[in-house]
Design a protein with these regions (language model features):
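Conserved HGGG/HGGXW glycine-rich cap/lid loop of the alpha/beta-hydrolase fold
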Residues: 8-63
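Residue in the alpha/beta-hydrolase core beta-strand immediately N-terminal to the catalytic nucleophile
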Residues: 51, 87, 110-113
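Conserved acidic catalytic loop of the alpha/beta-hydrolase fold
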Residues: 69-86
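Gly/Ala-rich beta-loop-alpha elbow adjacent to hydrolase catalytic centers
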Residues: 90, 94, 98
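Flexible "cap/lid" loop of the alpha/beta hydrolase fold
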Residues: 99, 103-104, 108-153
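Conserved alpha/beta-hydrolase catalytic His-Asp/Glu region
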Residues: 124-138, 152-213
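Conserved loop-alpha-helix segment in the C-terminal half of the alpha/beta-hydrolase fold
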Residues: 213-251, 257
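Post-His helix in hydrolase/transferase enzymes
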Residues: 257-271
């Protein structure tokens, strides 16, 4: 489905159903189809899956895709769908958007879930005072990737950078058909739009100050073999906001692909708590 939201095309799916709506926000550089395997676990619920700018069927951003802009897109789409309040679930960058949505529209959040997503800022692209050498190095790499995406006009630079690291080693080696499926999802995204998503992530505001304000059902899912995030850090995030913490063994940065049933079960239990 496609709607025009504030003059911009936004891709989404709306399952219909009962209960508090569940909004699913995908990671980078992916789209709303990454949640396909969780549809069964959430059957009967109203589930809205959204494509972020530059991904799937959504138009790319004209400038840096700030998390606040993306959260505003979600809010405007929910307005059009007649949804006043929803539980928001975000994977990776989708988690950043989830936190931005909570900061901007806390009264509309009935539940909050972070899937392989952290809350700390990226030190303003590594240029902020106090940024570590590691942060600066990572930021420089992301800056270069954004430029490569714009220069080539293809997703190949992002695929080469992210695909091998997103999955647990055993999964990457033993499930070639799913690796190719993931590659295909990445390949069909808008390269220039994804460059703007990178720039938006670089300057995002951290969400540590929000955690104590979470008074709704919350969930944090971590992959034990995630090379981007330390599960211990995500456990601390869960503790800080009183969330249920689910650690998935032999899983990397993509629980929806690597452990679809366990991820679906976690989301179903979360949805039940939301009501």
């Amino acid at each position: 489905m496609i709607r025009t939201v504030d003059g911009r095309r936004i891709g989404y799916d709306d399952s219909g159903g009962t209960g508090t709506p569940i909004v699913l926000l995908h990671g980078f550089p992916l789209d709303r189809t990454v949640w396909d395997e969780q549809a069964g676990a959430l059957a009967g619920r109203r589930v809205v899956r959204v494509d972020l700018r530059g991904c799937g069927e959504s138009e790319p951003s004209d400038g840096p895709a700030l998390m606040e802009l993306l959260a505003g897109d979600v809010a405007a789409l929910l307005d059009q769908l007649g949804i006043e309040r929803a539980a928001v679930v975000g994977h990776s960058i989708g988690g950043y958007v989830t936190l931005a949505f909570f900061r901007m529209f806390a009264e509309r959040v009935a539940g909050l879930a972070l899937i392989a997503s952290h809350v700390a800022a990226d030190a303003a692209g590594g240029a902020a005072a106090g940024a570590s050498v590691t942060q600066r190095t990572l930021a420089a790499g992301r800056d270069a990737l954004a430029l490569d995406l714009e220069r080539t006009g293809t997703m190949e630079p992002a695929i080469a950078s992210y695909l091998p690291r997103y999955l647990a080693p055993a999964f990457y080696a033993e499930r070639p058909e799913l690796v190719e499926r993931l590659r295909a999802v990445m390949a069909c995204q808008d390269a220039r739009g994804c460059a703007q998503l990178i720039r938006g992530m670089q300057v995002r505001v951290g969400g540590e100050d929000l955690l104590a304000d979470v008074r709704v059902p919350a969930l944090v899912v971590a992959g034990a073999q995630d090379t981007y995030l330390d599960p211990k850090t995500l456990r601390a995030v869960a503790n800080a906001m009183g969330a249920v913490y689910v650690r998935l063994e032999n899983v990397g940065h993509l629980p929806m692909f690597e452990a679809p049933r366990a991820t679906g079960d976690a989301l179903a239990a979360f949805a039940q708590r939301v009501g």
